[in-house]
Amino acid sequence: MSKNIVVLPGDHVGTEITNEAIKVLNAISEARPSIKFNFEHHLIGGAAIDATGVPLPDEASKKADAVLLGAVGGPKWGTGSVRPEQGLLKIRKELGLYANLRPCNFASDSLLDLSPLKPEYAKGTDFVVVRELVGGIYFGERKEDEGDGVAWDSEKYSVPEVQRITRMAAFLALQHNPPLPIWSLDKANVLASSRLWRKTVEETIKNEFPQLTVQHQLIDSAAMILVKSPTKLNGIVITNNMFGDIISDEASVIPGSLGLLPSASLASLPDTNKAFGLYEPCHGSAPDLPANKVNPIATILSAAMMLKLSLDLVEEGRAVEEAVRKVLDSGIRTGDLGGSNSTTEVGDAVAKAVKEILA
């Protein structure tokens, strides 16, 4: 069994964290020789701008089973007309990666004390933010300030776009027994696009998934619930592109470090565990961080999501998650988690644990 993975390290810590994820994937191959991973590296972000003048060269492969991304951006490239982040927007749009999945939970309960929330409020937090990724205000019509002191952006959604992301949320909810509740976040009291969103989500669940429940929350009240009692949102949280961008970042601090949280961006339902997807940590490129200090766990867990959702290697993906728990519980941690271990030491420990679990 051979799997083709495009690796886009990106900028700054991107190379370090993708190297550790590759190390863990290679450990799977060592434990299970029938599983082979072929890695093809390409540039993205600032590294691509420096080398080619554009943030995502056209030769980046679209024929892989999945894409593993490190991180893009940094102060060197600023906010000019050519920016590293444009590479991310381009690859999402070109590859049709319409659904961004960001789990919010604790990789280990031993990390509860690191949360900014009191342990009694944070314990048990377990939800997935499902963010619509290729529509809305980030891709709408806009006007820059051309000297007249006026600029604007437009938010546009269609019924098919909202139906598609709703079906993704419903699919994920139905993977559990009993099915998970769905929370839909919008601003329907103000925005026309949110009123269409709410109506379409409601009708899609009612007509296609009557066994599921959906509750609607205004995005501002959901933001308050998230810091006051995050377990109330346990289940599947579905929202549009901009709201999802913001609320998932808010959620990411609950487990105590951005270095822990993975993400997946999918082009189709993972109903056969073979959806094409791009996998990346939730954190940025950390340009100020010294070498070998970044936490690789988020990228390693992103690789675990890739194994389960795109590569049809569910058992191996769960083994990676279990290995991460064991390593964290053993006290092997980077500085962001109060430890003193290096990036490579954490990666080595997870790779070793994976081989032991799969032996």
From Swiss-Prot:
Keyword Hydrolase applies: no
Pfam families: Iso_dh
UniProt enzyme class: oxidoreductase
Binding locations of NAD(+): 74-85, 284-295
Ligand binding (substrate): 92, 102, 131, 220
GO cellular component, one term: cytosol
GO molecular function, one term: magnesium ion binding
Gene3D superfamilies: Isopropylmalate Dehydrogenase (3.40.718.10)
InterPro entries: IsoCit/isopropylmalate_DH_CS, IsoPropMal-DH-like_dom, Isopropylmalate_DH
Enzyme Commission no: 1.1.1.85
SUPFAM superfamilies referenced in this protein's UniProt entry, alphabetically: Isocitrate/Isopropylmalate dehydrogenase-like (SSF53659)
Site residues (Important for catalysis), renumbered to this chain: 138, 187
Cofactor(s) this protein cannot do without: Mg(2+); Mn(2+)
Taxonomic superkingdom: Eukaryota
GO biological process, one term: L-leucine biosynthetic process
Catalysed reactions, semicolon-separated: (2R,3S)-3-isopropylmalate + NAD(+) = 4-methyl-2-oxopentanoate + CO2 + NADH
Residues that, per the record, bind Mg(2+): 220, 245, 249
Disulfide cysteine pairs (residue numbers): none
Subunit structure as annotated in this protein's UniProt entry: Homodimer.
Protein role: Catalyzes the oxidation of 3-carboxy-2-hydroxy-4-methylpentanoate (3-isopropylmalate) to 3-carboxy-4-methyl-2-oxopentanoate. The product decarboxylates to 4-methyl-2 oxopentanoate.
Family, per entry: Belongs to the isocitrate and isopropylmalate dehydrogenases family.
Protein name per the record: 3-isopropylmalate dehydrogenase
Organism whose genome encodes this protein: Kluyveromyces marxianus (Yeast)
